[in-house]
C-alpha cells in the first residue's frame, strides 16, 4: 500500500493538469461538443502509454486480484462491472483509474442524440458480421428522397400499406433500427473505399482535422454534398458547432452553413420516423435493405433537424443581439423554405414579439409579415398562434402592442377564406379590449382602495388626488392599434356577421369616442362611420360626437389631422340634413380662423368639396344676417300660457332689426345672456321631438333654392295646435347659437359665412386666394395636399432651394405605405423668374418677388460700377506718373476704397430708393469729388510757388467759407424754407456739372518744363544767398564786440 500512494498522488496531479488544459482550450473555443470537429482535449494525452501502464498495474500489485479483474475492460466505461465496482469499492486507486482513462473517440457514425459521440464497440461488432446485399454508394444521386421513392415503387408497387399498432410495433422498430445502423455503416465503408482514396478527398479529410474554422466548415459542406448518407459524421460536426455553448463565433458561421445544407437535404414533404413506416412487411433482399437504409437515414435526419430547431430557439433567446438577429433570420428562412418543424419554428418566431428589446420585437413583426406575404394560406395558423400569445398571463403591454400591430398589418381580400379571417381578427381585437378594460378597472379599484386606506390612516391630510380619466382609458398606442386593425378588417367581413358585431360592439365604440386621446377618438368615429355607411343608418349620436371633436385644440395638431378632415368630408357629403351640414360648415370656418395656413387651406378645400354636393349652401356665402319686420313675412310666436310674460318682449318689439356686416363686425341692439342651464336642459329634452321634423325642414330647404321668404316654412295643422316651449334667446343675429351641442338645432342655416371675408385678407396668399375663390362663387381647383404642400417644412425646402429627392421611399407599413411629397414639378430657385407673376402659385409669390428684387439690385450695382470707371482710370494714370512712395500710398488708398465699396454694396442697394437731394441736404454722404478738387487746387498753388504765409491765409479763408456754408445750410434746413433748399439743390447740381467738365489737375511735364527750370535756378540762387548771409552776420557780431 505504501508503494501505491505516491503513484496515486502523481496521477492526481496529472489529471488536474489535463483538466486545466482542457478547460482552457474549451474557453478559447478550440474544443466543441464532438471530438470529430477537428480538436479535442484528448489530443494532449498519450493513450498508448496509459494503456501499457494500466496493463502493468496488475503485475505489480498482485494483492488486488479482484480489482485487476474488474479493471481489465477499460475500453467500456459504462459497463455493468465498472458500475458495480464503483458502488462496492471506495478505494483511492479507483478514481485514479477513472481519471486516467481517456474518453473514447467516436466512431464513424452515430444514431444517438447524446453529445458523447459514437459508440465504437458496436461498429467493431459490425466488422465481424457478414455484409448484406445493398445498393452501391456510387449509383445513387444527391437527392436521396428521389432514390427512396424509386425503391418504394419497386418494393410495394405503388400500393398503400397500413402501419401496424404502435404498441405491438415497438419491438419490430428496435430490431429494424439496429439493422439500419448496420446497413449505414456498411454503406459508409463502401463510400470510403470507392471515393475516399482520391487526392481531393484526402485533402478535404485533412482540412477537417487540422484546418481553420472556415476550412473545416467548407470541408464539412463538401462531404455532405458529396453523399449525405455516408457522411453523417460531417453533418453532426456542423450541428455540434451550432449547439455548442462554448465559442459563439462558431454559431455565427455554423448557422448559415447548416441551414443551407438542411434546406437541400429536406424534401418538400414532412419527414417520417421509423414508427410511421411499415417495417413488418419489408422484404429481406437487396431492394428491401436499400429501402430500409433510406428510411433509417430519414429518421436520423429528422432527429438532427429537431436538435437544430432547438438550438435556433436557444440562440434567439441569447443575450448577444447579433446572434439573436441571426437566429431570427434563420428561423424565417427555414419557415418559408420547408414545412418540417414549422410549428416549433412559428412558436419561436411569435415568442420574439415579447422580446424586451424593441429592435428584436420589430424584427419578429417584420419577419411574420413577410411570411404571410410569401405563404398567404398560413394566415389562420399564424393568427391562432398570436391569439394564444396575446392571452398569456402576465404578458406586458409592449408585447401586446407588437402583437396587435402585426395583426393590423395582415392583408385581406374578399376572396377565399379571407372574410372568415377578418371575422376572426375582429373577435381577437374586441376580446383583447375587454381583457384590457377589466384589468384597468381592477387596477383602478385597487388604487382607490389604497387611497381610501391611506386617507383613513392620515385623517389630517385633506388633499386627495381624484382621477378624472374614465375607466376606458388605456394605453393610447394599444387602443390606436386595435382600432386600426378593426377599421381595416371590418370592410371584409360578410354582411351577416357584421350585424352581430354592430349590435355588440357599438356601445364600446361610443365610449372610446370620448377618450382623452384624440387619435383614439378619431379612429372610433371612423369605424362608426363605416358601420353606418354599411347599414345605411344615420346616427345622430355619431354626428353629435363628431361636431364636438371640432372644437378640440388637438383636432388639427395631431398626427391624424388628414384622417380627421377626410372623415369630416365623408360625413358631410353623406348627410341629408342640410341644417346639420350648415352647422358643420360654420364650425369648420371658425376653426380655420385659428389654425396655421396649411390647415386653413385644408378647411377651405373641404368646404369647396362640400359645396359641390350641396349647392343650397352657396346662398349662405353672401346672405346677410338680419331679422327685419316686414309686412309680407309670416311670423310665428310661441303660445304663452298663464301670466308668463317675457321680460325682453318690449325690447324685441322696439328694436327687431339686427345686422352683421360681412367683415365680422356685429351690430346688435339686444342685451342679455345667451342661455341658461334650465333652458339648455329643456332644449336637449325636446331634441327627440325635433328629430322628426329635421328631415322635412331639410327637404324644404333643398327644394327652395331661390330665396323666397314667403315659402320658407310650412306648418301643418298638428304643428299649429301643438304648443311650443319658448326657445332660449340668442345673442347672435338670426338665432345662431354656436355653443349648442346638437348641430341640427343651432340655426346655422340662418347665419352668414362672414369668416370668408376675414380669410380673404389673410397674410398667407394661398389662404387669401382660396377664400376669395369661394366668395366669388366658384369652387377651388387644387390637385395637391395642402397639409403637406403648405407646411413650414415645405416652405423651408423651397427657401433653401432643395432639389427633389429620389423616387425611393422608406418607412410606412406595407398595407399603408407613407406618402412621399411630390417634388417633381416644383420650380426651385431662380427658375421661378421664367414664369410670369400671374402664372406663379400663390404660395410661391414670395419667392418670385424675392428673386425679382435680387435681380434688380444686381443690375443697379453693375450700373454704379460702370459710372465709376472714369475715376478709376484717373487713379490708374496717377499711379503710372507717381513711381515713388507717394504712388504706393495712393495705390493702397484706392484698394481700401474699392474694398469698402464692395463691402457696403448691399447697403448702397438698400439706399437706392432714397432721394439724393434729401441726402445732400442732410449731409449724409461724403462727396469724394470735393476732395479731388481740393487736392487739385493745392497742387496748382504748389506749382505756382506761393509763399507759406499766403497759403495759410488762403486755407483759413477757405475754412471760414466752408463754415459759413454749413451754417447757411443748417439754417435753411431748420427754417424749412423751400427757396433756400431749391437754391442749394441748383448750386449742388451746377457744382457737379462743373466738376464733371473740369480737366484733370495733373498737367503734362512738357507744358510746365520752363517753370520747373526757373524754380531750379531760383533754388540755386537762394542757396547762395543762404551761404553768404551767415558770414555777414558773423562780421556784424565781431564789430559789435570790438565796440
Curated annotation (Swiss-Prot):
Expression across tissues: Mainly expressed in actively dividing tissues (e.g. root tips, lateral root primordia, shoot apices, young leaves, inflorescences and pollen grains) through the plant, including roots, stems, leaves, inflorescences, siliques and seedlings, and in gametophytes.
GO biological process: embryo sac development; polar nucleus fusion; pollen development; regulation of cell division
Gene null: resulting phenotype: Female gametophyte mutant with impaired progression of the mitotic cycles and lost synchrony of female gametophyte development leading to an arrest of female gametophytes at the two-, four-, or eight-nucleate stage and characterized by unfused polar nuclei. Defective pollen development.
Extent of motif Nuclear localization signal 2: 441-448
GO cellular component: nucleolus
Motif window: Nuclear localization signal 3: 1022-1029
Compositional bias (Basic residues): 47-59, 988-1000, 1032-1043
Residue window of motif Nuclear localization signal 1: 44-51
Pfam entry (one): CBF
Region: Disordered, residue numbers: 32-113, 444-469, 632-737, 861-1043
Cell location: Nucleus; Nucleus, Nucleolus
Keywords annotated in UniProt: Nucleus
Main function: Together with NOC2, probably involved in pre-ribosome export from the nucleus to the cytoplasm. Required for coordinated cell cycle progression during female gametophyte and pollen development.
Subunit structure: Interacts with RBL in both the nucleolus and nucleoplasm. Binds to NOC2.
Protein name listed in UniProt: Protein SLOW WALKER 2
The gene coding this protein: SWA2
Amino acid at each position: 500500500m505504501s508503494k501505491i500512494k505516491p503513484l496515486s498522488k502523481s496521477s492526481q496531479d496529472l489529471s488536474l493538469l489535463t483538466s486545466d488544459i482542457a478547460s482552457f482550450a474549451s474557453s478559447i473555443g478550440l474544443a466543441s461538443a464532438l471530438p470529430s470537429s477537428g480538436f479535442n482535449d484528448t489530443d494532449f494525452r498519450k493513450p498508448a502509454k496509459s494503456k501499457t501502464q494500466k496493463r502493468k498495474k496488475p503485475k505489480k500489485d498482485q494483492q488486488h486480484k479482484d480489482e485487476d479483474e474488474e479493471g481489465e475492460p477499460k475500453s467500456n466505461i459504462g459497463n455493468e462491472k465498472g458500475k458495480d465496482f464503483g458502488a462496492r469499492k471506495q478505494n483511492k486507486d479507483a478514481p485514479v483509474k477513472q481519471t486516467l482513462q481517456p474518453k473514447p473517440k467516436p466512431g464513424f457514425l452515430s444514431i444517438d442524440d447524446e453529445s458523447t459521440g459514437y459508440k465504437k464497440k458496436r461498429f467493431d461488432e459490425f466488422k465481424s458480421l457478414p455484409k448484406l446485399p445493398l445498393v452501391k454508394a456510387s449509383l445513387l444521386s444527391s437527392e436521396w428522397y428521389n432514390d427512396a421513392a424509386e425503391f418504394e415503387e419497386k418494393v410495394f408497387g405503388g400500393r398503400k400499406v397500413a402501419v401496424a399498432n404502435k404498441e405491438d410495433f415497438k419491438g419490430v422498430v428496435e430490431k429494424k433500427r439496429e439493422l439500419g445502423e448496420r446497413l449505414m455503416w456498411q454503406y459508409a465503408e463502401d463510400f470510403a473505399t470507392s471515393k475516399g482514396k482520391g487526392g481531393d478527398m484526402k485533402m478535404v479529410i485533412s482540412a477537417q482535422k487540422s484546418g481553420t474554422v472556415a476550412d473545416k466548415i467548407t470541408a464539412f459542406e463538401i462531404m455532405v454534398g458529396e453523399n449525405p448518407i455516408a457522411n453523417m459524421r460531417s453533418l453532426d460536426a456542423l450541428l455540434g458547432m451550432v449547439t455548442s455553448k462554448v465559442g459563439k463565433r462558431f454559431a455565427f458561421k455554423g448557422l448559415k452553413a447548416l441551414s443551407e445544407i438542411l434546406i437541400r437535404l429536406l424534401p418538400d414533404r414532412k419527414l417520417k420516423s421509423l414508427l410511421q413506416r411499415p417495417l413488418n412487411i419489408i422484404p429481406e433482399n437487396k431492394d428491401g435493405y436499400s429501402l430500409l437504409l433510406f428510411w433509417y437515414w430519414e429518421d436520423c435526419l429528422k432527429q438532427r433537424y429537431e436538435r437544430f430547431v432547438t438550438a435556433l430557439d436557444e440562440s434567439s433567446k441569447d443575450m448577444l443581439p447579433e446572434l439573436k438577429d441571426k437566429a431570427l433570420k434563420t428561423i424565417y428562412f427555414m419557415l418559408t423554405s420547408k414545412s418540417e418543424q414549422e410549428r416549433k419554428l412559428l412558436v419561436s418566431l411569435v415568442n420574439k414579439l415579447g422580446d424586451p428589446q424593441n429592435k428584436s420585437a420589430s424584427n419578429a413583426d417584420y419577419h411574420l409579415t413577410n411570411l404571410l406575404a410569401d405563404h398567404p394560406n398560413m394566415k389562420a395558423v399564424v393568427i391562432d398562434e398570436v391569439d394564444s400569445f396575446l392571452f398569456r398571463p402576465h404578458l406586458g403591454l409592449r408585447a401586446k402592442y407588437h402583437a396587435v400591430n402585426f395583426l393590423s398589418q395582415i392583408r385581406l381580400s374578399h376572396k377565399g377564406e379571407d372574410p372568415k379571417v377578418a371575422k376572426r381578427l375582429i373577435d381577437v381585437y374586441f376580446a383583447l379590449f375587454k381583457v384590457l378594460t377589466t384589468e384597468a378597472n381592477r387596477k383602478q379599484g385597487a388604487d382607490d382602495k389604497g387611497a381610501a386606506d391611506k386617507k383613513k390612516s392620515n385623517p389630517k391630510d385633506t388633499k386627495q388626488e381624484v382621477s378624472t380619466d374614465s375607466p376606458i382609458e388605456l394605453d393610447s398606442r394599444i387602443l390606436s392599434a386595435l382600432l386600426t386593425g378593426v377599421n381595416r378588417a371590418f370592410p371584409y367581413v360578410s354582411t351577416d356577421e357584421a350585424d352581430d358585431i354592430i349590435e355588440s360592439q357599438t356601445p364600446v365604440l361610443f365610449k372610446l369616442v370620448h377618450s382623452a386621446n384624440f387619435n383614439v377618438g378619431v379612429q372610433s368615429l371612423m369605424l362608426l362611420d363605416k358601420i353606418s355607411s354599411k347599414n345605411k343608418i344615420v346616427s345622430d349620436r355619431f354626428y353629435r360626437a363628431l361636431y364636438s371633436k371640432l372644437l378640440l385644440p388637438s383636432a388639427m395638431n395631431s398626427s391624424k389631422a388628414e384622417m380627421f378632415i377626410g372623415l369630416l368630408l365623408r360625413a358631410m357629403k353623406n348627410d341629408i340634413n342640410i341644417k346639420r351640414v350648415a352647422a358643420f360648415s360654420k364650425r369648420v370656418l371658425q376653426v380655420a380662423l385659428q389654425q396655421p395656413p396649411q390647415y386653413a387651406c385644408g378647411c377651405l378645400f373641404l368646404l369647396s368639396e362640400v359645396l359641390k354636393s350641396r349647392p343650397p349652401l352657396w346662398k349662405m356665402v353672401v346672405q346677410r344676417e338680419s331679422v327685419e319686420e316686414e309686412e309680407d313675412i309670416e311670423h310665428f310666436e310661441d303660445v304663452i300660457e298663464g301670466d308668463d310674460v317675457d321680460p325682453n318682449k318690449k325690447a324685441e318689439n322696439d328694436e327687431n332689426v339686427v345686422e352683421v356686416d360681412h367683415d365680422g363686425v356685429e351690430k346688435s341692439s339686444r342685451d342679455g345672456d345667451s342661455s341658461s342651464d334650465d333652458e339648455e336642459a329643456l332644449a336637449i329634452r325636446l331634441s327627440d321631438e325635433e328629430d322628426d321634423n329635421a328631415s322635412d325642414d331639410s327637404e324644404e330647404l333643398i327644394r327652395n333654392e331661390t330665396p323666397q321668404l314667403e315659402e320658407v316654412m310650412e306648418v301643418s295643422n298638428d304643428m299649429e295646435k301643438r304648443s311650443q316651449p319658448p326657445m332660449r334667446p340668442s345673442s347672435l343675429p338670426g338665432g345662431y347659437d354656436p355653443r349648442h351641442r346638437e348641430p341640427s338645432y343651432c340655426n346655422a342655416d340662418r347665419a352668414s359665412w362672414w369668416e370668408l371675408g376675414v380669410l380673404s385678407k389673410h397674410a398667407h396668399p394661398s389662404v387669401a386666394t382660396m377664400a376669395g375663390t369661394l366668395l366669388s362663387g366658384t369652387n377651388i381647383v387644387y390637385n395637391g395636399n395642402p397639409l403637406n404642400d403648405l407646411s413650414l417644412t415645405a416652405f423651408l425646402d423651397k427657401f433653401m432651394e432643395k432639389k427633389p429627392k429620389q423616387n425611393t421611399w422608406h418607412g410606412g407599413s406595407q398595407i399603408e405605405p407613407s406618402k412621399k411629397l411630390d417634388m417633381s414639378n416644383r420650380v426651385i430657385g431662380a427658375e421661378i423668374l421664367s414664369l410670369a407673376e400671374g402664372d406663379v402659385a400663390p404660395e410661391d409669390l414670395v419667392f418670385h418677388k424675392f428673386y425679382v428684387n435680387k435681380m434688380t439690385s444686381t443690375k443697379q450695382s453693375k450700373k454704379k460700377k460702370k459710372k465709376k470707371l472714369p475715376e478709376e482710370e484717373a487713379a490708374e494714370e496717377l499711379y503710372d506718373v507717381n513711381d515713388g512712395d507717394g504712388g504706393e500710398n495712393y495705390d493702397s488708398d484706392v484698394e481700401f476704397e474699392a474694398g469698402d465699396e464692395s463691402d457696403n454694396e448691399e447697403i448702397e442697394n438698400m439706399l437706392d430708393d432714397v432721394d439724393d437731394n434729401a441726402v445732400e441736404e442732410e449731409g449724409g454722404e461724403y462727396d469724394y469729388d470735393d476732395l479731388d478738387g481740393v487736392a487739385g487746387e493745392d497742387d496748382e498753388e504748389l506749382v505756382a510757388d506761393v509763399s507759406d504765409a499766403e497759403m495759410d491765409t488762403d486755407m483759413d479763408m477757405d475754412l471760414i467759407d466752408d463754415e459759413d456754408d454749413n451754417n447757411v445750410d443748417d439754417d435753411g434746413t431748420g427754417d424749412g424754407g423751400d427757396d433756400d433748399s431749391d437754391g442749394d439743390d441748383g448750386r449742388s447740381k451746377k457744382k457737379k456739372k462743373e466738376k464733371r467738365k473740369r480737366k484733370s489737375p495733373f498737367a503734362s511735364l512738357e507744358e510746365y518744363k520752363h517753370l520747373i527750370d526757373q524754380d531750379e535756378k531760383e533754388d540755386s540762387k537762394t542757396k547762395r544767398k543762404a551761404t553768404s548771409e551767415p558770414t555777414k552776420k558773423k562780421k556784424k557780431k565781431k564789430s559789435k564786440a570790438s565796440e
